[in-house]
Amino acid sequence: MAAAFAYRWLLCAAGIVNVLPIGAQRHTASDNPSTYNIGGVLSNSESELHFHTTIAHLNFDQQYVPRKVTYYDKTIRMDKNPIKTVFNVCDKLIEKRVYAVVVSHEQTSGDLSPAAVSYTSGFYSIPVIGISSRDAAFSDKNIHVSFLRTVPPYYHQADVWLELLSHFLYTKVIIIHSSDTDGRAILGRFQTTSQTYYDDVDVRATVELIVEFEPKLESFTEHLIDMKTAQSRVYLMYASTEDAQVIFRDAGEYNMTGEGHVWIVTEQALHANNTPDGVLGLQLEHAHSDKGHIRDSVYVLASAIKEMISNETIAEAPKDCGDSAVNWESGKRLFQYLKSRNITGETGQVAFDDNGDRIYAGYDVINIREHQKQHLVGKFSYDSLRAKMRMRINDSEIIWGGKQKRKPEGIMIPTHLKVLTIEEKPFVYVRRMGDDEFRCEPDERPCPLFNASDATTNEFCCRGYCIDLLIELSKRINFTYDLALSPDGQFGHYILRNNTGAMTLRKEWTGLIGELVNERADMIVAPLTINPERAEYIEFSKPFKYQGITILEKKPSRSSTLVSFLQPFSNTLWILVMVSVHVVALVLYLLDRFSPFGRFKLSHSDSNEEKALNLSSAVWFAWGVLLNSGIGEGTPRSFSARVLGMVWAGFAMIIVASYTANLAAFLVLERPKTKLSGINDARLRNTMENLTCATVKGSSVDMYFRRQVELSNMYRTMESNNYVTAEQAIQDVKKGKLMAFIWDSSRLEYEASKDCELVTAGELFGRSGYGVGLQKGSPWTDAVTLTILEFHESGFMEKLDKQWIFHGHVQQNCELFEKTPNTLGLKNMAGVFILVGVGIAGGVGLIIIEVIYKKHQVKKQKRLDIARHAADKWRGTIEKRKTIRASLAMQRQYNVGLMARQPPGTISLAVDKRRYPRLGQRLGPERAWPGDAADVLRTRRPYDLTKSGLVPPALGLGKTRPQQNPLPPRYSPGYTSDVSHLVV
């Protein structure tokens, strides 16, 4: 309140001065001035002398002063009365046309006098360079429009705090600050800078508690009670020297300054007379070196004026405080040039930020030892090679609270932890206790469902990979625990939820992660995959098991189809074999037919010589050789055909041998292959209707697919198929309802080793690991990580793998099952038997067709025979009549011839050669050859013609066997009725 009242008086005084009738004169020139007055409001005569000497030396430094330019100093003494200071600035500095003012003051006199100089000079746009003022108020450019300083403000120490926390790896802190402007400024600076600072470092510090107190403390006990219940034991304090004494006094009474507690304080608090041992504090380098800051401020001003002269025209500075209309634009431009300076001075690297505050200021890190001795243990200084600030700490020189040499953990480490897990075979098996059970088995641990509001009894027992890991961890790093199951059975994912009474969406975690983020649990020991989304909100130990993502599917069925015996050859090869059989048969037939030794028989050849090969016999021969059946007949006769037959036999031998060998490979040693080749399988990337794949909703695998742009199409397809738990998905894979389940490789490899019908497809992708989850900034993170690394080195993790995941005996049985030849059964060879059955049925069918066809042919032949018999009978009747007529005519002529005693002539008769035809001989008359009567008699059937007088007995034809019912001969005139040729 006093400071605000004083500021109002300063503003009133500045207004009074502005209306004084002193008279104003403006000066503008096209050329830059050759002389420049630099004002100084200094605290003592020594500073005034040094200011005068510095400007005198500056005039001889051609690097900063152009030719024909001279600097002059105009100084006044800083008055503790700010109103007097305002009048002195107007009368003794502005009236002398000063282009800038350098101001310093005694640290004990307060900062009101520099503020008066800043107000007055700023009204006329005259730059003011402070060399001792460090209050946060001077950073407000709405008030101190032309003020910049070669010393940093107090609240810039927050930057050094962040460097120290990063160096000591402290992740959780408590900030103690006063409620004044500087106290709130340092808190704001810490929170703002940490947002960008921690983007470049691995360790992020969070503020667990903020303690704000009113200045001029009398007691700090009430705040210490809250601080003691917090987890953090690192205190960052901004307080005045007087307030720091009260805080240290009360903190000592609560034993909060001893072993395990870390205090990092600002410059003012470091000078308290009761600062505890082990406190770390900051001290600005050259903080009390007015000479160094005077020199740096003068040279910064000279550098800015030189650059401004080379770039633009500088108007003369204002000369009168009475002219309120003065607007010195050159002063505003000069202030911008000053802020852009970056030079190496006596106090280090001198540069300014947008507020005109010094940056690159160096700090000493002070460690308080016994009897309030200050010991330098580090520096925060500018690194010219990297062009940035760098922290250097000698850790071995630090004495911590309680006179400890070892760095405290910085947090209160609880020894009894709330540990959560989740059912996930083989890492965690969950068993419900029976009604008659009162305790779990020795290798099990009680694990009730986690419910903060319901103290349920231990109804479940847990065992497995993670439980054994938890038991061993608790032994190694010495903590006790209460184990509980996930409240909703999920690992957890974040959802957007509306805040009550607000329009904004808030990201909220569920499941195990949610309990850890909300600090309702201390640790998660489960197959928890490490991924970026989770690592942003919780801590992870180093992986206790490395794994990735893979695909689980059911093996293709090993049962053979009815045409399994055809598998050794491809369809193309079978077609070629079938074509080859008939082509070879055709060529054999042609070779045997056109061979001179195949078709024609020799004249002297035996009648039993084998006949030439016909086409049907050639086909039979080709098939017989191919099927290795005996060939009893129908073999090639020619040499060329027999050569081809031998070649065909060799071909058949190779084909049959190859078929037999491949048949064994397909039916006896067949090993099923996976359907999918991996995540890059085209059927997964372009999912078809008959291929379903899924994962678990909200899991790490689900998050992985969301991150991968190239898998977005696949994720959109599978999103609707995702399951709530992995157990449900695995059961559906076994039942064949789900073709591919995408999940952590450790679980799927376990399932595949347990069930020989399951197999993992393709290579691992999305490689990661399982880690122990802890709260952000948990004190157990490092201890758990180091212990897990020791477990890896000692072989303990490998032992857990063999015991719980791989199940060596089961996996060996699966491999034995895969390598054991299948015993051929009816299912394997059913096709062959069916083929034989088809052959038998075909043969029976063909014989039935043949019988039916034969019956039809017999009936047809019978009808033809009847018709032929009728025709023959009719023809016989006609011929008989013709024969009788011819016989009568011949007899008459014969009789006439006898009477004329002429020798008999030749006649042509058609007679039946035999009375009874031979078997198979066609019925009907045959044409006899022309001849005499004797010829006729010789061809007639034995008949006694002596009675008829036609043939005398002397012909010697009487020797005939007796005939019953002798029939007369039938004469036929050779199928013609013309008998004119007959000669008697």
From Swiss-Prot:
The Gene Ontology biological process annotation of the record reads: behavioral response to ethanol; calcium ion homeostasis; chemical synaptic transmission; ionotropic glutamate receptor signaling pathway; long-term memory; medium-term memory; olfactory learning; phototaxis
**Organism domain of life:** Eukaryota
Q: Per the record's keyword annotation, is Chloroplast included, yes or no?
A: no
Q: Which residues are glycosylated?
A: N255, N311, N342, N394, N451, N478, N498, N690
Q: Name one GO molecular function term.
A: glutamate-gated receptor activity
The function of this protein is: NMDA receptor subtype of glutamate-gated ion channels with high calcium permeability and voltage-dependent sensitivity to magnesium. Mediated by glycine. This protein plays a key role in synaptic plasticity, synaptogenesis, excitotoxicity, memory acquisition and learning. It mediates neuronal functions in glutamate neurotransmission. Is involved in the cell surface targeting of NMDA receptors. Plays a role in associative learning and in long-term memory consolidation.
Q: This protein is called what? A: Glutamate [NMDA] receptor subunit 1
Name of the gene: Nmdar1
